[in-house]
A protein has these predicted regions:
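Protein kinase-like catalytic core scaffold
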Residues: 123, 172, 225, 269, ...
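C-terminal active-site "lid" helix and adjoining low-complexity regulatory extension at the edge
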Residues: 262-266, 275-313
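Short hydrophobic segments within beta-strands
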Residues: 7-8, 220
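Short acidic-glycine loop/turn motifs at beta-strand connectors
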Residues: 27, 47-48, 219-223, 276-279
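Loop-centered beta-sheet repeat module
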Residues: 129-183
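Conserved N-proximal alpha/beta basic substrate-recognition cap immediately N-terminal to
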Residues: 10-22, 33-149
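Phosphate-binding site of ATP-dependent enzymes
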Residues: 23, 167-261
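Extreme N-terminal starter segment of soluble prokaryotic enzymes
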Residues: 2-6
Length: 313
């Protein structure tokens, strides 16, 4: 049997299934840490000198591919009256129990995988790099301060500040600070008083709308594996793609994307960019857990094979 490779994610999730098949085709022994089954149906143990999946020690893993691990604050129902039923039953009476259990689960999984890294296992991507997907404003600041071209950005809960920003940059798009919803254009309907007051509930990220087309770039290690224009009639192309057009990045742009990946502490990324009509590229985000099967199927780009090479190297 060849090298042992771990996969963190749902055992039946498409990317986990696919990478398991690719790695086993290379002779690897693949161990799936099924995050969907833990803790109810998957035993994991952290000891002073060992990390165990069931009774199977994992410190001899050569590498781990982290496909999905929920690394954010657990959800809880803030307003218990929303759960009150006509008969008086409170649906969310035990929300604090669920909240605490999920918090414990996330803390355990995060420490479990990070400890494997401390014990010499190659982690792709390091759990700490997922911070910058959850902390999108910090990622933008890191990239901008390093000279990476990113959109002009304003995150605020102040309606007056938003109005001034919109006047300054013209066309504006917005999205949640932590992600989880599609990017949308700011319209006059968003700038009415009752709509703006919703910012008092939670801030949002507002950015200049960069004209041009969407480009997805996959990087593994220091290699740009593919760069593709994604055609869509919608601002947020996810799920609405109408075509894929592979392109060759200018060397300086390829170098810029690799540098951005490194700044974010990533070994593998799917980076989102905009290609402006004047030929300039603007980086939107580096994703630590990028989906790639659709791109492999649409363009034949060897993202999966290159990722397998990196895990086995």
């Amino acid at each position: 049997m060849g090298k042992r490779i771990g996969i963190v994610g749902g055992e039946e999730e498409a990317h986990c299934v696919h990478m398991k098949r690719v790695l086993e085709g290379r002779g690897a022994e693949v161990v799936v840490l099924d995050t969907n089954r833990f803790p109810a149906r998957q035993d994991m143990t952290f000891r002073d000198d060992a990390t165990l999946l069931g009774q199977d020690g994992l410190t001899d893993l050569h590498a781990v591919y982290v496909r999905t691990i929920f690394y954010s604050l657990p959800f809880f129902e803030a307003d218990p009256t929303l759960g009150q039923q006509p008969g008086g039953e409170t649906l969310f009476a035990d929300w604090h129990v669920d909240y605490t259990a999920e918090r414990e689960r996330q803390s355990f999984l995060t420490s479990f995988v990070r400890a494997l890294g401390l014990r010499g296992v190659k982690i792709v991507n390091p759990i700490e790099s997922f911070d910058l997907h959850f902390l999108k404003l910090l990622q933008i600041a890191i990239l901008r301060d390093a000279g990476i071209p990113v959109p002009r950005t304003c995150a605020t809960n102040d309606p007056a500040t938003l109005a001034a920003f919109a006047d300054e940059v013209g066309k504006v798009v917005y999205k949640p600070v932590t992600g989880g919803a599609s990017c949308q254009r700011l319209t006059d309907k968003d700038l009415v008083a009752d709509r703006l007051e919703r910012l008092r509930n939670a801030p949002a990220i507002f950015q200049e709308e960069v004209p041009g087309v969407n480009v997805r770039v996959y990087v593994v290690g220091d290699e740009v594996v593919s760069a593709t224009i994604i055609h869509s009639d919608d601002l947020d192309y996810r799920g609405t793609e109408t075509g894929f057009e592979p392109i060759e990045l200018p060397p300086a742009v390829a170098e810029m994307v690799v540098r951005a990946k490194d700044l974010c502490g990533l070994a593998f990324t799917g980076a989102d960019l905009r290609l402006r009509p004047d030929g300039e590229f603007v980086l939107l985000e580096c994703n630590p857990s990028a989906m790639f099967l659709g791109m492999v199927q649409a363009t034949g780009a060897p993202i999966d094979e290159t990722l397998a090479d990196y895990l086995l190297a």
